[in-house]
């Protein structure tokens, strides 16, 4: 299956009209950025580049696609002929997956003809907006968990395709595992899961259910103890599995007090090494509220796969420069609508790091395009002496002349993004992790 029709109709009608006007093959630069962060957020985590590069490889119009477009009279015959030969031959630079961003960060720069670049708008935004929303929410949950493991468990709270993308994005942001098996197969995300309440209800007694689970999965399994009565569930779990029981799970109740009671009961029964994991519609706020409680791990569902109240990151894809006819000068272009202003010119990002290794500002460099070559590529980082400020370059090549950089793709790309996200988040000032309203973690400085 191609990915070419995962787009909006107006992308193709723009191409149709632009080819007719003679502007369709004009060299252009498009940029992806966020005008603002969702309410209560201090930073975002960009994710989805690896998935986008995969989708880009399949972005072509096959016979079935073209036949449907012709039948629906979406575009002219001339444009259908152009689409039949479509392969993205341009270049894409941008922030690497897992990088932190703030308003104005030039997350992606797409360079090509107007026609070949504009047709990617919907695919780019639908991928990055969702994945970045999940990764941004997940990063806040990781910070709130105070180093305790988190598992993504939201597959039943979103579409089947989004569930896989969400598991991937959450893992990049620091979640340790997912319940989604396809995310494990396709992206190498560690998977986990044992039993639901239905398994307990299937058996004649809670003890029978626990015994069947332990005999099948071993004493290291996690037993769900709140189907009936939690105190009795703990007692039964330890009696069946012994003091070596791996973990118990709580999915309901007043968690701050309940986990303390369960911890005390487990310890009194000699199961001092048995862990407690909690689920129950957790958010970053409820996780933070359990910081002092004896919780060993968390399972998060609805809130992480829906971006914890911000299901889209608010990213936009705007034309920022085009070349004058016949190889002339490059001209910055910008939108000036109230509330939706954009800045013209090709850009690249740099982060100012102070002498303690903390990020203090986001520098957005507007490159001079008058020489006819927009320069949105990576630059070397300016590393200062120990204890002195330094500059970290944020823009890297993702696609060059139509060829994707394989480093950022597949399970290996996911692990690179995960490692980088941990580093990038650790650079942020402490106030970036506050969950209340406030300014972005870093000021955006245009240069």
Question: Which residues are covered by each model-predicted region?
Answer:
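Segments forming glycine/polar-rich beta-alpha architectures that bind adenosine-containing cofactors
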Residues: 92
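A residue-level signal for beta-strand positions that form part of recognition/binding surfaces
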Residues: 29-31, 89, 150, 316, ...
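Contiguous mid-protein beta-loop-alpha structural module that forms a pocket-lining wall or clamp
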Residues: 277
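Gly/Ser/Thr/Ala-enriched C-terminal appendages of enzymes
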Residues: 1-26, 40, 269, 274, ...
């Amino acid at each position: 299956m191609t990915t070419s029709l995962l787009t909006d109709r107006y992308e193709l009608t723009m191409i149709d009209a632009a080819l007719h006007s003679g502007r369709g093959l004009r060299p252009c630069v498009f940029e992806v950025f966020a005008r603002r962060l969702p309410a209560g957020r201090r930073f975002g985590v960009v994710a989805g580049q690896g998935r986008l590069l995969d989708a880009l490889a399949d972005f072509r119009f096959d016979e079935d696609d073209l036949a449907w477009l012709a039948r629906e009279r979406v575009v002219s015959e001339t444009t259908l002929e152009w689409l039949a030969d479509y392969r993205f031959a341009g270049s894409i630079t941008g922030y690497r997956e897992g990088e932190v961003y703030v308003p104005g960060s030039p997350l992606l720069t797409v360079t090509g003809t107007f026609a070949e670049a504009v047709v990617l708008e919907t695919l780019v935004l639908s991928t990055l907006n969702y994945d970045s929303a999940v990764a941004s929410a997940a990063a806040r949950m990781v910070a709130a968990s105070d180093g305790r493991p988190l598992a993504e468990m939201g597959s039943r709270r979103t579409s089947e395709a989004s569930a896989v993308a969400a598991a991937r994005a959450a893992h990049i942001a620091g979640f340790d595992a997912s319940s989604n098996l396809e995310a494990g197969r396709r992206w190498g995300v560690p998977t986990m899961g044992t039993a639901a309440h239905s398994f307990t209800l299937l058996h004649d007694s809670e003890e029978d259910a626990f015994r069947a689970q332990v005999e099948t999965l071993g004493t290291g399994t996690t037993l769900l103890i709140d189907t009936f009565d939690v105190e009795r569930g703990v007692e039964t779990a330890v009696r069946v599995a012994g003091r070596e029981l791996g973990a118990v799970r709580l999915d309901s109740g007043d968690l701050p007090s309940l986990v303390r009671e369960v911890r005390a009961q487990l310890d009194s029964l000699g199961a001092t090494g048995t862990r407690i994991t909690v689920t129950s519609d957790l958010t970053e706020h409820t996780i933070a509220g359990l910081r002092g409680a004896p919780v060993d791990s968390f399972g998060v569902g609805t809130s992480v796969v829906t971006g914890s109240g911000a299901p889209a990151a608010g990213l936009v894809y705007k034309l920022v420069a085009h070349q004058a006819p016949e190889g002339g000068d490059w001209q910055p272009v910008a939108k000036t609508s109230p509330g939706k202003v954009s800045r013209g010119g090709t850009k690249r990002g740099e982060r100012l790091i102070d002498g303690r290794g903390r990020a203090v500002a986001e520098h957005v460099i507007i490159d001079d395009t008058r020489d006819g070559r927009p320069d949105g590529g990576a630059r070397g980082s300016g590393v200062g002496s120990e204890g002195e400020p330094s500059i970290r370059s944020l823009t890297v090549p993702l696609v060059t002349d139509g060829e994707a950089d394989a480093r950022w793709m597949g399970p290996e790309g996911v692990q690179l993004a995960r490692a980088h996200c941990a580093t990038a988040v650790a650079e942020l000032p402490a106030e970036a992790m506050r969950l209340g309203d406030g300014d972005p973690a870093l000021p955006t400085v245009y240069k």
